């Protein structure tokens, strides 16, 4: 009676009463015996629960479907829809995110895509169908930015292998792909690269300049710069290829990431888009194909815009665009190379790919001769690669305003040294070297070089 009186008083006072409700236990759940796909720490499984006839307990036999994966978002690149799938490939210590086109889910092309990313997936068609349903119907539906080009997106930097550096304003997924994706590895630390690679280049201005081109690549895009490159030329082979490998080791394995002028024009532009806002190393222009083809490739590469292409289902594909900084080498300057091949160079080509004489390496930094010195740099560039460039990009991501300010300051200094009647082409060249100068000053913590040493290299 006292209880009822108390409750009536609470109701009259406007209080909300929580009546005791008997909740279902997990054993009484209606869905407990429902077959399902489960994502576990060691993979994805098809689970078919059933009641054991003898014990009456529920047992959970399961079949393996693949490595651990789950849908964490959705996105659209302006043409196609995507599911963002979080992957944990066997043997890898990092999580990767794959933007899988919705029209590939459940098809051989989709499973091939996952396997190409290092993910193990069953060959059973029955289980693949279950996996396709799981990816489409379960998981999160957070909106992601989907891009087919690497580089700066939403305030963060997307590496050509899909790795995100920095903190994006919203989640970003990469749906493109570099032909050299396996080259974007990390071996050693940024400090080891500085102490073993950059330190051996000290005092050799042409070698240092090559590294500055690599460092300028992600910086160039932050300030809205266009595509450009530096072509180091000399009759001798004293250090040009070594320089390219050292610069390339900023971002990954030099042997895998290095390109050739023998590639097709379309191939180079697709690779440029995949490495957008990044570094393009192209060794020995004299080893390429026909000179006219190389001239066309160079023009397309530094133009920064791909060709319009039609879609199979009608209409046109989105035009691909890119910004890159390239490092090329050869025995002759680019203009002479073209003229000897019967090609009249365009002014725009020469301004975008700047020919700079390569000064022979003379400072061996503890080694007896140039051969020992070059071999050491090649060895260390392979052993300690990828970390320094990522640390540099991470620093840029956290210090964008400072980086832009230093570039603008350097550009004003370089332009102030020109005659008043300097041509627009000359001013553009000065702006390129101002960019390299700024990269050297900002990246002293990466290279270990002083600002004076970096400035002297430009």
Q: Residues of each region from the PLM?
A:
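Modules that initiate DNA replication and primer synthesis
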Residues: 1-23, 412-414, 419-432, 437-457
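Short alpha-helical "patches" and their helix-cap loops
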Residues: 1-3, 224-240, 343-348, 407-412, ...
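Conserved glycine-centered beta->alpha loop in an early N-terminal alpha/beta scaffold
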Residues: 17-201, 270, 275, 339, ...
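Short, charged/polar micro-motifs that form catalytic or ligand-binding hotspots
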Residues: 121, 200-209, 233-237, 284, ...
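P-loop NTPase catalytic core of nucleic-acid-dependent motor ATPases
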Residues: 168-254, 433
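Active-site-adjacent structural elements in folded domains
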Residues: 175-184, 196-203, 258-268, 310-313, ...
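Conserved NTP-binding/hydrolysis core of motor NTPases
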Residues: 208, 217-392
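Conserved AAA+ ATPase small/helical "lid" subdomain
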Residues: 374-432
């Amino acid at each position: 009676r006292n209880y009822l009186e108390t409750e009536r008083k609470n109701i009259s006072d406007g209080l909300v009463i929580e009546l005791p409700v008997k909740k279902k236990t997990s054993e009484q759940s209606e869905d407990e015996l429902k077959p399902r796909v489960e994502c576990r720490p060691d993979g994805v499984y098809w689970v078919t629960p059933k009641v054991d006839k003898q014990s009456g307990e529920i047992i959970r036999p399961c079949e393996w479907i693949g490595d651990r994966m789950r849908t964490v978002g959705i996105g659209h690149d302006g043409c196609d829809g995507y599911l963002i799938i979080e992957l944990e490939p066997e043997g890898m210590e990092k999580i990767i995110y794959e933007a899988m086109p919705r029209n590939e889910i459940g098809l051989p092309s989709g499973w091939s895509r996952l396997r190409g990313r290092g993910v193990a997936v069953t060959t059973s068609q029955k289980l693949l169908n279950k996996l396709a349903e799981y990816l489409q119907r379960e998981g999160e539906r957070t909106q992601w930015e989907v891009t087919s080009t690497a580089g700066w997106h939403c305030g963060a930097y997307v590496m050509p292998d899909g790795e995100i550096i920095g903190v994006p304003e919203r989640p970003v997924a990469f749906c493109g792909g570099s032909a050299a994706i396996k080259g974007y590895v990390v071996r050693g630390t940024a400090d080891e690269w500085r102490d073993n690679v950059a330190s051996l280049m000290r005092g050799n201005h042409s070698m240092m300049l090559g590294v500055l081109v690599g460092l300028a690549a992600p910086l160039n895009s932050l300030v809205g710069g266009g595509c450009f490159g530096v072509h180091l030329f000399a009759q001798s082979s004293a250090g040009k290829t070594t320089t390219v490998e050292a610069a390339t080791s900023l971002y990954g394995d030099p042997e895998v990431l290095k390109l050739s002028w023998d590639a097709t024009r379309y191939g180079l532009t697709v690779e440029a888009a995949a490495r957008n806002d990044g570094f393009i190393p192209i060794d020995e222009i004299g080893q390429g194909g026909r000179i006219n083809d190389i001239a066309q490739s160079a023009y397309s590469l530094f133009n920064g815009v791909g060709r319009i292409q039609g879609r199979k289902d009608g209409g046109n594909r989105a035009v691909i665009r890119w910004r890159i900084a390239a490092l090329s080498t050869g025995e002759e300057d680019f203009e002479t190379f073209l003229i000897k091949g019967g090609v009249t160079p365009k002014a725009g080509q020469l301004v975008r790919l700047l020919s700079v004489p390569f000064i022979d390496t003379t400072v061996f930094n503890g080694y007896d001769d140039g051969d020992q010195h070059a071999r050491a740099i090649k060895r260390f560039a392979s052993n300690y690669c990828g970390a320094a460039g990522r640390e540099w990009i991470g620093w840029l991501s956290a210090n964008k305003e400072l980086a832009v300010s230093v570039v603008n300051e350097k550009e004003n200094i370089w332009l102030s040294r020109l005659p008043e009647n300097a041509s627009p082409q000359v001013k553009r060249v000065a702006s390129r070297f101002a960019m390299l100068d700024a990269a050297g000053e900002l990246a002293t913590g990466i290279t270990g070089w002083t600002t004076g040493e970096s400035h002297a290299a430009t």
